Amino acid sequence: MKIVYITGCLGFMGSYATRMALQRGWYVYGVDKVTYAANPKLLDEFNKYENFRFIRRDIKNLKFLNDCDYVINYAAES
C-alpha cells in the first residue's frame, strides 16, 4: 500500500487528490490548516475511509513526516 501526505487536503485541488488516492487504496495523511480556503465538510467523506488520517496543522509546523512514498503539496491560499 502506498503512503502519501497530502497538504491542503480540504481545499479545491487537494481534496481531489485526496479522493483519488483514497479510491486507489492508498493510505492518506491529509494535512490542512483549515483556513477560509478549506471545506471542513469534506472530512465527513474522507473519514469514511479506514486508510485516512487527518492532521490539522500548518505545514510550517510539521516537525517530521513518517515513512511515506509521496508528499503532494496543495497547501496555498489565493
Walk through the language-model features, giving the residues of each.
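N-terminal Rossmann-like NAD(P)+-binding domain of SDR-like oxidoreductases, especially those catalyzing
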Residues: M1-S78
